[in-house]
């Protein structure tokens, strides 16, 4: 039996390898392994909790320098007096807000998810982006189409 989904995943993994983006390639290969093994029973959990687990792991990575002490408290304090750091804080707040809108939109309009995912995978694979794009992209879409 011909599995079109598997073929698409293999194509996306190949795109990840061709573009030297191991994040995309490894992620898709893990999903392929899950798909073709008895682990496929975990897909409902992955679909429901995967985004949350991914955000937790991403947050751990971002917060690690603070927790390890390699980013001293004095640097954090100085971020409130440097104009570039203040811009970074403002942009961080804005992007977090967009991501929140994106999560809401993806839940309320699942027909948009496919386009967001394809765009994100292409952005990650071709432009060396990172796969946080669907949430922010969905937030931007929500601003354009007027949905929360």
UniProtKB/Swiss-Prot annotation:
Protein's UniProt keywords contain Transmembrane: yes
Keywords: Cell membrane, Membrane, Transmembrane, Transmembrane helix
Protein name from the UniProt record: UPF0756 membrane protein CKO_01811
Keyword Cell membrane assigned: yes
Highest taxon of the lineage: Bacteria
Localization terms from the record: Cell membrane
Residue intervals passing through the bilayer: 14-34, 51-71, 86-106, 121-141
Organism: Citrobacter koseri (strain ATCC BAA-895 / CDC 4225-83 / SGSC4696)
Family listed: Belongs to the UPF0756 family.
GO CC term (a single one): plasma membrane
Lineage of producing organism: Bacteria, Pseudomonadati, Pseudomonadota, Gammaproteobacteria, Enterobacterales
Coiled-coil portions: none
Record membrane topology: Multi-pass membrane protein
Major place of residence: membrane
């Amino acid at each position: 039996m011909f599995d079109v989904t598997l073929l698409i995943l293999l194509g996306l993994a190949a795109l990840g390898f061709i573009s030297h983006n191991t994040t995309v390639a490894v992620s898709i290969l893990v999903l392929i392994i899950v798909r073709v093994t008895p682990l496929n029973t975990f897909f409902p959990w992955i679909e429901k909790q995967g985004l949350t687990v991914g955000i937790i792991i991403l947050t751990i990575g971002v917060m690690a320098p603070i927790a390890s002490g390699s980013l001293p408290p004095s640097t954090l304090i100085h971020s409130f007096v440097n104009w570039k750091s203040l811009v970074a804080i403002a942009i961080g707040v804005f992007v977090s807000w967009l991501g929140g809108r994106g999560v809401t939109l993806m839940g309320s309009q699942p027909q948009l998810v496919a386009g967001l995912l394809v765009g994100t995978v292409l952005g990650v694979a071709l432009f060396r982006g990172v796969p946080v794009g669907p949430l922010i992209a969905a937030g931007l879409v929500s601003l354009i189409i007027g949905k929360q």
